[in-house]
Structure formats: C-alpha cells, structure tokens
Amino acid sequence: MTSLRVAFAGTPEFARAALARIHAAGHDVPLVLTQPDRPAGRGMKLQASPVKQLALDLGVPVAQPMSLRLDGKYPAEAAAAQAALLAAQIDVMVVAAYGLILPAWVLELPRLGCLNIHASLLPRWRGAAPIHRAIEAGDTQTGITLMQMDQGLDTGAMLLTAVEPIGPADTTASLHDRLAVLGAELVLQALDAAAAGTLQPVVQPLEGVTYAHKIDKREAPIDWSLPAAVIERRVRAFDPFPGATFSLGGDTLKLWSAQVVDLPAGHGHAAGEVISTEGGTPLVACGEGALALTQLQRAGGKRLSGRDYLQARPVVVGVRAG
C-alpha cells in the first residue's frame, strides 16, 4: 500500500467510520475539516461533531470554517481553511457527509481530486437523505458510491460501488450503520487504486436520477389515509429522526414499529380508527389495510411494546388516531 496524504472532510457518525479506517490503514491525515460545534442536548451546550471528536483523539488538526467560499459571508474563515489545506500538501481529499459546499478551489487543490462517499447507488438518490428516502420508497437494495466530486449535486463520475440489501425490518439507523462500515471499506480500496493510478471514472447515466430531499420535521405526523404499507415504510425511514408521530386518547406518540395487516374490501372502517386491541396490540385502519402498532413511545417516555402501552393506557376500540 502506498501511503497518501489525505485531508478528510466530514461531520456526522457516518463519516467517523471512514476517518478511523483511513487513519488505521496508515495514510497520513494532516487535516480534518468538519462543521462548527453546534448546540445539542437538553442543555443546548456546544457539542463537537463525531468527526471532530475522533480527530482530536487521533491528534489530527481540525478546521471548522462556517464556509469555504472565498467570496461568501465568511471570507476570513475560508481563507484560513485554504491556507491550512495548502500547507498540508495533500494528495487527495475524502469527503463524507461534510455539509458544506466545496467551491472550485477546493476541488482543484488535491492532485488526485476529492473523493466523496455517498450512501446510495448513484444516480438514484442524489442529495441529503439517501438512506431515509430509499427505505421510504420501498427499495430492496441501496449501497455506497465512491464518486469523483465536481461542482454539481452528487453528479460526479462514479469510481467504485458496493451494494447493500435493504431488509424488511431495516430502519435508517440500522442501514446507516452498515453503510458507514461499507463506505469505510470502499474508500480504502479507492485510495489504493488512486495511488496506483488505476481508478476508472464512469460518467453517471442520465436515466434513473432521483433526489433524496432533506428530511423535514413537518414530515413526522402520520397520515392515516395513506396505505398501511406506505406508513410502515415511513416509520422505519424516520427512525431515529424525526420519528413518525400521531395522537391517541390524549397522548402524543411516536410510532417506532408496526406490522401491515390486510383488511377485506368494504370493511367500513375509517382511516385512523382503532379497530381492535385483540392480542394486546392496537390495530389502526389506514387508507388501505391496517397497521398493528407494535412499538410506541409517549412524549418524555421510553419505547414500549404495543402490549405494554395498552396495559398502561387502555384504548377503546372505535376511537380515532390523529
């Protein structure tokens, strides 16, 4: 293996796994770029990103500019980051869920370019929330694409891909963790190939482009008029954030797990109606079919099975979930 000088740009837990593998593999990481510390938790105290926390543990210098645009709102911070990158004399930059747009001067600086770890099989699910949207859409597989970055939104040439199945019980949390590991493995292959000069970029096809728009908290409320299968996928897609929310018997709840139940044609139940509690699980009619609510959480409480919830908060058949 040829050791490269690798700048790393990333912020969340997804990116942390890649930084750890790059460093452990023996590549020299002279600089890490990550988002500025943000308020988090109940006390809203400033908290470092997972990538920053790891970089500090590894003794790697960290830069946290608000922007990298030299002509933007924070030109001094961008100029300082530019100086740090130039001084680092990097061969390549690896980018994973960084959260800032990379202007042309960044893309052109490393001799081997900027490699992006994207959590989908491009060109499907370009954009900010590819894991969530793949589950929500009912995709049976997704994966990782290693991409040579350009100035478009996830439009660069594909370098390497790896496929990951999506299981019927997968949530964004479970799929995220597997893809983070897969991305870390794939980026090491890409760095070895880049050092050897054997990477073969493939232009993304024009067909099959979809966009994974950023998840909005306003998507959380459950629309019971939708088919049960659609709602069930959204429940898994929105775990852990923002959660699928609804109201029942005066409680504000998050639904973390549900099972689709077929109903006969002409059943006569309204969407959102609790039609049974037999077997210890609330069964709610949807626009098509019904959902057995198998794991719920009251505001401020812990996650409970449907049975445990009913024991604590009995539900009358016929009431409507909001």
UniProtKB/Swiss-Prot annotation:
Keywords: Protein biosynthesis, Transferase. It is an enzyme of class 2 (transferase). One of its GO terms (cellular component) is cytosol. It holds the Pfam family Formyl_trans_C. SUPFAM superfamilies: FMT C-terminal domain-like (SSF50486), Formyltransferase (SSF53328). Its EC number is 2.1.2.9. It comes from the Bacteria. GO terms for molecular function: methionyl-tRNA formyltransferase activity. It catalyses: L-methionyl-tRNA(fMet) + (6R)-10-formyltetrahydrofolate = N-formyl-L-methionyl-tRNA(fMet) + (6S)-5,6,7,8-tetrahydrofolate + H(+). (6S)-5,6,7,8-tetrahydrofolate binds at S120, L121, L122, P123. Attaches a formyl group to the free amino group of methionyl-tRNA(fMet). The formyl group appears to play a dual role in the initiator identity of N-formylmethionyl-tRNA by promoting its recognition by IF2 and preventing the misappropriation of this tRNA by the elongation apparatus. NCBIfam families: fmt. Belongs to the Fmt family. This is Methionyl-tRNA formyltransferase. The gene is fmt.
